[in-house]
């Protein structure tokens, strides 16, 4: 293929591709995902293929005469691993069609985060004998120092190492070469406050130091084993910068962030998964309301070159309500690219398939912008409304634009409006009756716009009727 296509395969980035016409042939060049994504791009250019939702795929149909495009293009994603934000698009087929690939995690129990207990230290197995050494004082987290007992710490680390090997053998044994294993603390629980953990926090200013000191030796041994057992393959061990362990162990020296010492520099095969749980997601990370979280990310980038990012785009206190992160997606994804983020999960309504039309819009934008953060945002919106809402495009676009305008008004007139993913903003004061009635009018207009289709095309009518809400 190198000679016939004239393409140097070694120059194609990971997940990238080149599509090139040579005489009467079209070569789609790349490896693994790259070939797949190149094939979908070929379909896009040749047959107007575009996926907008699970049940809405645009494609030129009943074509009888088609001239082959003269291809000479190359592309690769700005963010290497792009996880779908909403549940209905998480299947392998949907991810492939949207050029997403969040299925990078190896797990036996299906719990790919907050899994330090389930995946590595199940209480049913260890708590009766190791309760006072391996678990935090309240039993809700691990103790990453084993109460300062070096022998017990070594046993804990070896337990993690052996578990990592088991998971790799399980997946690689069936030719499923995924690239990450999460070793992440439990959710909504304080970190250990034993004397040894407290001393680590006192010295480094963060609970994260104990986690780094725990995992770095494991990562070194794991890399040696992986190189010997599966040469040419790489697997990240991923730890959280989250809640009580969100702060990075750095200091300021000559006006620059630097590691507090060399022991907290994270090994190359350890991914640092930053999840700014308390950030304001009605504003982008460059807004003054998120200065703390942007600075925290900068600090972590000093001690890790292997960054993962978890953001939020849903209201988890009112799951069915609008949560207007549309204005921040492009900006935040550009930030992720600029930080060389390896994996992005923009957490939406991940555990349900009952999505609204605007959830699907977020999923579409999530896919397009995480591949190309500089994509034309306005054009993406236009394409989605035209193809997804069809005859109801105009009233649904008015509804969408008016809602976003109202949210901008709320943010401009109420500086204390909370924007965390678990904040409650859905009050009569913020959304008065006359505003809601205006939006209901747009919805009624949308139903009227599709009414003629009821007799002409009942199948499409029913589909569109369900999308209007």
Task: Report the location of each language-model feature.
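Structured mid-domain segments that build the active-site/substrate or prosthetic-cofactor binding neighborhood
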Residues: 144, 155-162, 166-170, 291-394, ...
């Amino acid at each position: 293929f190198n000679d016939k296509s004239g393409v140097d395969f070694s120059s194609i980035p990971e997940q990238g591709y080149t599509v090139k016409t040579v005489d009467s042939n079209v070569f789609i060049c790349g490896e693994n995902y790259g070939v797949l994504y190149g094939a979908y791009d070929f379909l896009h250019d040749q047959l107007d293929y575009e996926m907008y939702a699970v049940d809405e795929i645009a494609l030129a149909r009943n074509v009888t005469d088609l001239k082959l495009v003269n291809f000479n293009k190359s592309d690769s994603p700005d963010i290497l691993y792009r996880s779908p934000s909403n549940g209905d698009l998480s299947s392998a087929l949907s991810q492939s069609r949207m050029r997403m690939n969040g299925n990078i995690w190896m797990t036996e129990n299906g719990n790919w985060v907050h899994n330090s207990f389930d995946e590595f230290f199940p209480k049913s197995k260890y708590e009766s004998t190791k309760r006072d050494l391996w678990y935090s004082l309240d039993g809700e987290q691990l103790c990453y120092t084993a109460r300062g007992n070096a022998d017990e710490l070594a046993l804990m680390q070896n337990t993690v190492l052996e578990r990592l090997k088991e998971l790799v053998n399980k997946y690689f044994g069936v030719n499923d070469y995924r690239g990450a294993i999460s070793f992440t603390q439990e959710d909504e629980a304080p970190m250990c406050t034993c004397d040894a953990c407290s001393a680590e926090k006192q010295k480094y200013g963060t609970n994260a130091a104990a986690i780094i000191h725990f995992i770095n030796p494991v990562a070194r041994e794991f890399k040696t084993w992986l190189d010997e057992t599966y040469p040419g393959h790489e697997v990240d061990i991923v730890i959280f910068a989250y809640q009580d362990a969100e702060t990075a162990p750095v200091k300021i020296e000559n006006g620059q962030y630097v590691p507090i010492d060399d022991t907290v520099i994270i090994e190359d095969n350890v991914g640092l998964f930053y999840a700014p749980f308390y950030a304001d997601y009605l504003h982008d990370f460059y807004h003054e309301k998120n200065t703390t979280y942007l600075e925290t990310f900068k600090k972590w980038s000093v001690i890790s070159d292997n960054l993962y990012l978890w953001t939020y785009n849903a209201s988890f206190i009112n799951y069915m309500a609008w949560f207007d992160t549309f204005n921040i997606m492009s900006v935040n994804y550009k930030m992720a690219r600029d930080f060389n983020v390896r994996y992005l999960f923009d957490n939406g309504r991940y555990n349900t398939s009952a999505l609204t039309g605007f959830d699907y819009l977020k999923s579409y934008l999530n896919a397009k912008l995480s591949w190309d953060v500089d994509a034309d945002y306005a054009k993406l919106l236009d394409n989605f409304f035209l193809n997804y809402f069809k005859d109801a495009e105009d009233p649904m676009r008015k509804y969408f634009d008016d809602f976003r305008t109202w949210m901008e008004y709320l943010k401009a007139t109420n500086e204390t409006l909370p924007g965390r993913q678990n904040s409650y903003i859905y009050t009569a004061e913020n959304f008065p009756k006359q505003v809601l009635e205006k939006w209901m009018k747009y919805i009624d207009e949308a139903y009227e716009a599709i009414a003629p289709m009821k007799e002409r095309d009942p199948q499409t009518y029913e589909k569109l009727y369900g999308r209007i809400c």
